[in-house]
Amino acid sequence: HFALGYLLADGGLYCILTITHQVAYPIHKYAPGLASWKERVLYGEAFGATWMTEIQGGSDLGANRTVARREGEVWRLYGGDKYFASGAGLADVALVTARPEGAPPGPKGLALFLLPRLDREGRLNYRVRRLKRKSGTRAVPSGEVELEGSEAYLIGRAEEGIYYTLETLTVSRLANAIAAMGIAAKALLETRERVRRRQSFGRFLADHPLVRYDLLDLSVRQAGGLALALAAVEAFDRAWHERPPYGEAYH
């Protein structure tokens, strides 16, 4: 996945792939009973998403107001207002944070759920209030999603939900770093091609010492950033199998 992001060098398309593959991660590790969804998102049969941010909290997940209630064989989510939901309208399934009834306040009271687009009766399982107007990553539809009685499936243990959530977000943070370095490499490639063709003061830009210096400086920065990003991916690859409470390898 990370090699793909580097070679793709497109933040919008890679975001869609990342939020899709993120769905597979906690299913594989903590919810083997939902393996059919893992196979669908990994083999291109379904798009995934991660919807956690709410309007009152932003990145403060502990402020989430979405309530999860066990009703018979399924959980239902109420009062959900996921305010910046990437993949809204596109995703077939999403990872969603919610607080089970009776759970403590704050981030440690959150559980992680799998939310299909359609419920068991084939009806739409959530409502997209509107899509955002964005200046960047416009290839990714981002919107506001309302959850009211939405069917969902619990990932792992409810009391460990915040840990699963942060693990899943780590995948996207690593993807962001790799994608940034891929985009930087693409920009350098295009720049080198341009300075070989463009002339000023009677010679090609590539022959000007200051231009050559700038390109060298940028190349070193890109190579260093890529090395750091790959080192982070390698560290995560060594420790991802750790479970809460994590050992020293994970920390």
Predicted ranges, named:
Residues 76, 80-125:
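A short core secondary-structure module
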Residues 173-242:
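Extended amphipathic alpha-helical segments enriched in small hydrophobics
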Residues 56-59, 84-86, 104, 134-141:
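Short Gly/Pro-enriched turn/cap motifs at secondary-structure boundaries
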Residues 1-39, 43-44, 86-87, 93:
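Internal helix-loop-helix
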Residues 46-52, 76, 125-130:
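Short Pro/Gly-enriched beta-strand edge/turn motifs at strand-loop
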Residues 28, 59-64, 87-91, 108, ...:
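Short acidic, glycine/serine/threonine-rich loops at helix termini
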Residues 120-125, 129, 134, 141-172, ...:
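A glycine-rich, basic-preceded beta-loop-alpha segment at the flavin cofactor/substrate interface
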Residues 31-66, 70, 233, 237-250:
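Internal maturation/activation junctions in enzymes
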